[in-house]
Curated annotation (Swiss-Prot):
Keyword Transmembrane among record annotations: no
PANTHER family xrefs: N-ACETYL-GAMMA-GLUTAMYL-PHOSPHATE REDUCTASE, CHLOROPLASTIC-RELATED, N-ACETYL-GAMMA-GLUTAMYL-PHOSPHATE REDUCTASE, CHLOROPLASTIC-RELATED-RELATED
Record-linked InterPro entries: AGPR_AS, AGPR_type-2, NAD(P)-bd_dom_sf, NAGSA_dehydrogenase, Semialdehyde_DH_NAD-bd
Gene it is expressed from: argC
Molecular function terms from GO: N-acetyl-gamma-glutamyl-phosphate reductase activity; NAD binding
Gene Ontology CC, one term: cytoplasm
Active site per the UniProt annotation: 117
Cytoplasm as UniProt keyword: yes
Cell location: Cytoplasm
Record's protein name: N-acetyl-gamma-glutamyl-phosphate reductase
GO biological process, one term: L-arginine biosynthetic process
Domain of life: Bacteria
Pathway the protein takes part in: Amino-acid biosynthesis; L-arginine biosynthesis; N(2)-acetyl-L-ornithine from L-glutamate: step 3/4
CDD domains associated with the record: AGPR_2_C, AGPR_2_N
Length: 310
């Protein structure tokens, strides 16, 4: 019998993307409730407890409520896409390529917290350098990023696409998170193995899906003898054998005139680049992904598949 999957919040941006990725699959059975009943707590609780895996695509408080609904039912496993549990040590962090053991941790976990879109890129760049001893304690990490506006959910999509919206956004590109207290900073710090929080400057562009995350570094402040080439080698070694996260060869990066934020739109992969001048004193690390792909729904389905295969 096919395992039962319930997407709680299936009518939101992330939930709809998960349903699209699972359309036509015969190896799972999707449980569903009508959109009009999405706030029916009794019906939600029944569906949650009927599932083998519940995928929560909800705001933080609603996710916490849903977890309470299944806490006594050990037959239900949970993938949560909110920020509620991403630094909770009782939950497996759902970035399978984060280190060599992470995929197995996800596969065997009852509770999996899906990573945020920005942290997926930032951690993907930072953690390998911390693990390799290249990025020292106390380094003042800066993360700059631009996301497609779909990351803001239905409200921001309406603001960006409907010029008659009462709070329409007409800017082609804008910064936000200006007080430097973005909700993704804690998971960047914890899962990036950082001993101090990074300065994180997020922004949104006038494109629906796509993301660029940048981490600029001064080589003189890294481990002695660090070069652009040794950083690239550390990333290559960390992701050896991976298909979803790939490191672009230095020669290919050098040939680029620009990085297109929407290159991976609709894909569930991530590309990592190392830019700089050979022999120079600075490098810029770049992660390219779809904010709704590897940054959200694609990762959730990947985690589901790992859990089902265990």
């Amino acid at each position: 019998m096919a395992p039962k999957i319930f997407i709680d919040g299936e009518h939101g941006t992330t939930g709809l993307q998960i349903r699209t990725r699972m359309a036509g699959r015969r190896d799972v059975e999707l449980l569903s409730i009508p959109e009009a009943e999405r706030r029916n707590a009794a019906m939600r609780e029944d569906m949650l407890n009927s599932a083998d895996i519940a995928m929560l695509c909800l705001p933080d408080d609603a996710s916490k409520e849903a977890v309470q609904m299944v806490s006594a039912n050990n037959n239900v496993r949970v993938i949560d896409t909110s920020t509620a549990f991403r630094v909770n040590p009782g939950w497996a962090y759902g970035f399978a390529e984060m280190d060599k053991e992470q995929a197995e941790k996800i596969a065997s976990a009852r509770f999996v917290s899906n990573p945020g879109c920005y942290p997926t890129g930032a951690i993907g760049l930072i953690r390998p350098l911390r693990a390799a001893g290249i990025l020292p304690d106390g380094y003042p990490v800066t993360v700059n990023a631009v996301s497609g506006y779909s990351g803001g959910g239905k409200q921001m999509i309406a603001q960006m696409e409907n010029p008659d919206h009462p709070d329409a956004i007409t800017a082609p590109h804008f910064l936000y998170g200006l007080p430097l207290t973005h909700k993704h900073v804690p998971e960047m710090t914890v899962h990036g193995l950082l001993d101090r929080a990074p300065i994180f400057s997020p922004s949104v562009g006038k494109f629906a899906q796509g993301m660029i995350v940048q981490v600029p570094l001064h080589l003189d402040d890294l481990a002695e003898g660090t070069t652009m080439e040794s950083i690239h080698a550390a990333l290559v070694a960390h992701y050896a054998g991976q298909e979803i996260v790939t490191v672009v060869p230095l020669s290919d990066s050098k040939a680029l005139a620009r990085v297109n934020a929407v290159e991976l739109e609709g894909k569930d992969t991530m590309k990592l680049f190392v830019f700089g001048t050979p022999g120079g004193s600075q490098v810029n690390l770049v992660a390219l992904l779809d904010n709704l792909g590897k940054g959200a729904s694609g990762a959730a389905v990947q985690n589901m598949d790992l859990m089902l295969a265990s």
